Amino acid sequence: RASARNEHYLELLKDLRLMDDDFFSEALDEKIAPVEYILNTILERDDIRVQRTEAQVEYKSATKRSIKLDIRAVDAEGRVMDIEVQRAEKGAGVRRARFHSSMIDRTLLEKGDDFESLVDTYVIFITEQDRFGAGLPLYHVERKITELNDAMFGDGAHIIYVNGAFRDLEHPVGRLMHDMNCRDAKEMLNPLLAEEVRYLKETNGGRTQM
């Protein structure tokens, strides 16, 4: 019976991808280099240096709604980045993104701190389908001032939706989304992500960890 359970478990593990949030969190918990690659790709930069990452970070409230972040990363500038993987469209609603952003903000200042010292925050939803249906790799959400020709408000709160269905391998986001949807590490393009997937799926230590 134990052997049958083990076989069933291994079959389930074989099917998991980084697009599955629990597997994503397990693969990238406290992993600097792969998270740095993901953030630089999504933010279209090459200079983000991640200082620390943590998976399944819970923001609790005794009387109000709490949230749990798939991956929370902090970079060298102190910016806080929340990476969420959402396969169901319901889980990536625009008001949920707003709530995530506000819950992160409330943890960033101590009593007496100046509001202007708030660091920039990024809430990133990687969705399995194209959330907004325009075929774009990324959708950037920013507050703007309507009466000033949509000039940027510049409050430092950034929300980005990543189209998990975008698979153009000529585009950095397309390559990342290809890897996020791979079940086999050998098919993945980025060695940093492939290494983490390979460890969890193909080594005894990784399988035990899962």
Predicted regions span which residues?
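Acidic-basic catalytic patches of nuclease active cores, encompassing PD-(D/E)XK
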Residues: 17-52
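Active-site metal-binding core of divalent-cation-utilizing nuclease and nuclease-like domains
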Residues: 52-76
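Conserved catalytic cores of phosphodiester-cleaving nucleases, focusing on short active-site segments
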Residues: 39, 69-73, 81-87, 124
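Extended, gly/pro-poor, charged amphipathic helical "stalk/hinge" elements that serve as dimerization
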Residues: 15, 26, 56-57, 94-95
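Mixed-charge intrinsically disordered linker/loop segments at interdomain junctions
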Residues: 90-196, 200
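Short, mixed charged/polar active-site loops
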Residues: 66, 78-80, 92
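Short, charged alpha-helical interaction segments and adjacent helix-coil junctions
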Residues: 1-16, 22, 74-77, 81-86, ...
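Short acidic/polar alpha-helix capping motifs at helix-coil junctions
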Residues: 2-4, 32-37, 44-46, 74-76, ...
